[in-house]
Curated annotation (Swiss-Prot):
Protein name per UniProt: Bifunctional protein GlmU
Amino-acid positions noted as binding Mg(2+) in the UniProt annotation, renumbered to this chain: 108, 230
Enzyme class: transferase
Residues holding acetyl-CoA: 366, 372-373, 391, 409, 426
Region (Pyrophosphorylase): 1-232
Cofactor dependency: Mg(2+)
Subunit structure comment from the entry: Homotrimer.
Entry keyword Cytoplasm: yes
Length: 458
């Protein structure tokens, strides 16, 4: 099939009213990626060299989204909702370019995979004009049935039109199909709208092709792969299926997940062998983790790069631009954003590091803050190799701490510190003997007087 050209036509024009959302249905996300983008990825993995996405509701928002996740895809607008065949013909310009295979798919089936699509394409390569993808749901009620005879598909029958015998068929229509490019437009143009709704149904091409003496067959996908999303409950179901698959894939690739069901991956998470992930960890888009890292419980990571043998968390937050080098440590209740933590450096607890570099082997004490924002602009903090920053320090950017520099605890550092220098940035402590007792007695007396006055008012 590698020699056969292929176009995917992805139908994504529906309003999706059951989602009860201002966002077009197919832009709701699975693993941080719009549903329709998952469909495009599957089509491309199955050999589609071009993608035509048919849009309607929220067209401008859809165009912007498509540009982000698939710049090469084209969008075509279905101006009126006149049925699925009518929607496919909105992409007539693309279909007419002479592709060998046309994959017709739906933007709300995010779990479809290349294997199911390639099986349908294989049937076209073997001579079929149409290959319809079917599935076997636990309960077929409500689905159109695939009616076969002698190994050929002769009709797709909506349940309300099924005979009693046809209602017993468990093989149902998933809505997706592969159509030979040489026949596609002729078959689509032959679809009529003489039905109760006055719409043009894609399923009619099965009988039209059969009447023209063309071969029509059915292939089978799993129930999960064919799952269509119509509401938030089904969206959550699909998310669960996707996550379960990705967790299994990670574990079989050498990643240890202590409590797999509590770890959530993004569509693009990369994670190396011998990494250990503790319970309740969330990975957002753009995370790359090399082998041997340890991610402790309740960490939240997005847009971050974590090198080999790093240690993260528990309760750590790594935001976009966080770059942890080999054996770096970011501990509990720390946030790192747009910052490099170099080899062996330690940011152990209760710390914010933003727009900064922490040099190799440096140690950042508890409660340290890089003050990087003045309300208008961001500024950079550079902490040199082997530097030590004492607890509860504020580093007011732009500022640099030289190699081996030492910052005393509780300092507010507003000027750069040279290599190997010691810097204090705090008021000198003053101790007044007996003053503590005096204050305590004064405060106790004032509190008692206030309580007495309050009682008198009642």
């Amino acid at each position: 099939m590698s020699q056969r050209s292929c176009l995917s036509v992805i139908l994504a024009a529906g309003e999706g009213t059951r989602m009860k959302s201002a966002l077009p249905k197919v832009l709701h996300q699975i693993a941080g990626l719009p549903m329709v983008a998952h469909v495009v990825k599957a089509a491309d993995a199955a050999g589609a060299s071009s993608d035509a996405i048919v849009i309607g509701h929220g067209a401008e928002e859809m165009r912007k989204a498509v540009t982000k996740f698939s710049p090469k895809a084209e969008t075509f607008v279905q101006e009126e909702r006149l049925g699925t065949a009518h929607a496919v013909l909105a992409a007539r310009e693309a279909i007419s370019r002479g592709y060998d295979d046309i994959l017709v798919m739906f933007g709300d089936t995010p779990l479809i995979d290349a294997e199911a699509l390639n099986l349908a394409r294989l049937k076209l390569a073997e001579g079929a004009a149409v290959a319809v993808i079917g599935f076997r749901p636990p309960l077929p009620n409500g689905y159109g049935r695939l009616v076969e005879k002698g190994g050929k598909l002769i009709a797709i029958r909506e349940e309300k039109d099924c005979s009693e015998a046809e209602k017993k068929i468990g093989f149902c229509n998933a809505g997706m199909m592969a159509v030979a490019g040489a026949h596609a437009l002729k078959l689509l143009d032959a679809v009529g709208n003489k039905n109760a709704k006055g719409e043009y149904y894609l399923t009619d091409i099965v009988e039209i092709a059969g009447a023209q003496g063309l071969d029509v067959v059915a292939t089978e996908a799993s129930f999960e792969n064919a799952l269509g999303i119509n509401n938030r409950a089904e969206l959550a179901q699909a998310e669960g299926i996707w996550q379960a698959r990705r967790r299994q894939e990670a574990m079989l690739s050498g990643v240890t997940l202590i409590a797999p069901e509590t770890v959530y991956f993004s569509h693009d998470t990369e994670i190396g062998a011998d990494t250990v992930v503790e319970p309740n960890v969330w990975f957002g888009p753009g995370v790359k983790i090399a082998g041997g890292a340890k991610i402790h419980a309740f960490s939240h990571i997005e847009g971050a790069t974590i090198a080999a043998n790093c240690d993260v968390g528990p309760f750590a937050r790594l935001r976009p631009g966080a770059d942890l080098r080999n054996k770096a440590k970011v501990g509990n209740f720390c946030e790192v954003k747009q910052a490099v933590i170099e080899e062996g450096a330690k940011v152990n607890h209760l710390t914010y590091i933003g727009d900064a570099r922490v040099g190799a082997g440096a140690n950042i004490g508890a409660g340290t803050i890089t003050c990087n924002y003045d309300g208008f602009s961001k500024f950079f903090t550079d902490i040199g190799e082997g530097a030590f920053v004492g607890s509860n320090s504020s580093l007011v950017a732009p500022v640099s701490i030289g190699k081996g520099g030492y910052i005393a605890s509780g300092s507010v550092i507003t000027e750069s510190v040279p290599d190997d220098a010691l810097a204090f940035g705090r008021a000198r402590q003053k101790t007044i003997p007996g003053k503590g007792k005096e204050l305590r007695e004064r405060f106790a007396s004032a509190a008692a007087a206030k309580k007495k006055a309050a009682g008198a008012d009642h």
